[in-house]
Amino acid sequence: MGERAKALLVDDRKDNLLALEAILQGLPVTAVAVESGEAALKQLLTDDFAVILLDAHMPNMDGFETASHIKRRERTRHVPILFLTAADRDAQLALRGYAVGAVDYLTKPFDPWVLRAKVSIFVELWGKSQQLKAQAEATRERDAQWERLTETVDEAARVLRAGGEDAATEALALLEKARWGS
């Protein structure tokens, strides 16, 4: 369960990616930086992320198109997307970001401490989600064990009800086998 959370940083400008990596330094998250929407989609095929920081304006596939692809995929639709963009007075762009599934839309320059706080929250939520998944798996395994034990007890009871000279020995063997999980 000790898997470290990852943040996907998507921006066509290397200097912006370096700035984002510096802002996230010290947080319990591994930053994975890519320079295009296409590269982001490719990265999402192999890695799971706690959060995506996505530049809205990029050549070829912009952030809005990238986000819509991310939200259409079953494997990635739950990953929170924070749009980051250059100072923009057009409120319609923020609305467009929310329409394609963003959880937030920040314009540059933004307060790095605010971004750190937002990323920290999503990393914490991701960690809780991982814990819940592990607990759900443990519960499924326990339920399966109980199901097998119940079936064995039922079988032993059938053997005893059927009677016969070896019924008790056979029922006991079934129960012992179940007890040791074989």
State where each predicted segment sits.
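Conserved acidic segment of CheY-like receiver
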Residues: 3-24, 32, 52
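Active-site residues of response regulator receiver
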Residues: 11, 55, 85
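Helix N-cap/capping motif at the beta->alpha junctions
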Residues: 33-42, 63
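Active-site beta3 strand of CheY-like receiver
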Residues: 47-54
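Receiver (REC) domain active-site loop signature in two-component systems and cognate sites
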Residues: 58, 70
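Alpha4 helix (beta4-alpha4-beta5 surface) of REC/receiver domains from two-component response regulators
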Residues: 65, 77, 88-104
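C-terminal output helix
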Residues: 110-119, 123
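CheY-like receiver
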Residues: 124-165, 170
